[in-house]
Amino acid sequence: MTKKVGLLVMAYGTPYKDEDIERYYTDIRHGHKPSEEMIADLRGRYHAIGGLSPLAKITEAQAYGLEKALNESQDEVEFKAYIGLKHIEPFIEDAVEAMHKDGIEEAISIVLAPHYSSFSVEAYNKRAKDAADKLGGLRIKAINDWYKQPKFIQMWADRINETAKQIPADELLDTVLIVSAHSLPEKIKQHNDPYPDQLQETADFIFEKVVVPHYALGWQSEGKTGEPWLGPDVQDLTRELYGREKYKHFIYTPVGFVAEHLEVLYDNDYECKVVTDEVGATYHRPPMPNSDPEFLEVLRTVVWEKYSN
């Protein structure tokens, strides 16, 4: 009989329907109920992208697509995918419990975010480990980051180069690539958190492989907590770069994300485009990885390498 290995795929989660918005937001806020204004603001942003974020369906397609890719590429073990979400059901603990019930004794976990941070990925891993320890008999090998995987870098470089084809050749010199990820509270730097450096490395790796002659690093989608977050914010960065260099084309590449969700469809496609329109430049964004076979191959390679070692 083929050995069964759990595949715990963890992600942020998104509301499934309008009624979920309040409890989802309450979970993000550590149990503090948001004000009516906050809920209205979030609802308004979902409305602006045409309804609730497609993230839930994309996460499912990524998890089960990865399971299929792993099982079709070898016959040593059979992987079984379980989705564990941070802010809505199925929660990470629900997924670990389901693995335990299915008699899984060994699992690999991956967070659908390429960069490690004590604030994000570590929090996912800790919840999974705590749940497994409590139940007993289940060992989870966690993947901390996977931004260095050459196939990941190549995938983004190919997408950027494809997007650059839309730009007239004589305007390519006036084009800048903005590489970004979700901002985190600035206090992570006090603990030597590798997150900012990992984004910088990702940008450097990608920049070596693209035809775009300039790039800058930005942060986006920061929380409204009143404390300082990592910057510059992509919108401020756009204004600053235009003011200094008069770039005609801005290519936004939110490499910290892997799907078309609110942070991309609103914070990039709407908010950043407002700024490029304002300064008279053109907005571009390569397609997100979603559940494209090319991206599933990136994840498959990462998981298989972790399992094999």
UniProtKB/Swiss-Prot annotation:
It is found in: Cytoplasm. It catalyses: Fe-coproporphyrin III + 2 H(+) = coproporphyrin III + Fe(2+). SUPFAM superfamilies: Chelatase. Pfam families: Ferrochelatase. Keywords: Cytoplasm, Heme biosynthesis, Iron, Lyase, Metal-binding, Porphyrin biosynthesis. Pathway: Porphyrin-containing compound metabolism; protoheme biosynthesis. GO terms for cellular component: cytoplasm. GO terms for biological process: heme biosynthetic process. Fe(2+) binds at H182, E263. Fe-coproporphyrin III binds at Y12, R29, R45, Y46, S53, Y124. The keyword Metal-binding applies. Its EC number is 4.99.1.9. InterPro entries: Ferrochelatase, Ferrochelatase_AS, Ferrochelatase_C, Ferrochelatase_N. It comes from the Bacteria. One of its GO terms (molecular function) is ferrochelatase activity. HAMAP family: Ferrochelatase. NCBIfam families: hemH, PRK12435.1. PANTHER family: FERROCHELATASE (PTHR11108), FERROCHELATASE, MITOCHONDRIAL (PTHR11108:SF1). Involved in coproporphyrin-dependent heme b biosynthesis. Catalyzes the insertion of ferrous iron into coproporphyrin III to form Fe-coproporphyrin III. Belongs to the ferrochelatase family. This is Coproporphyrin III ferrochelatase. It comes from Listeria monocytogenes serotype 4b (strain F2365). The lineage of its organism: Bacteria, Bacillati, Bacillota, Bacilli, Bacillales. The gene is cpfC.
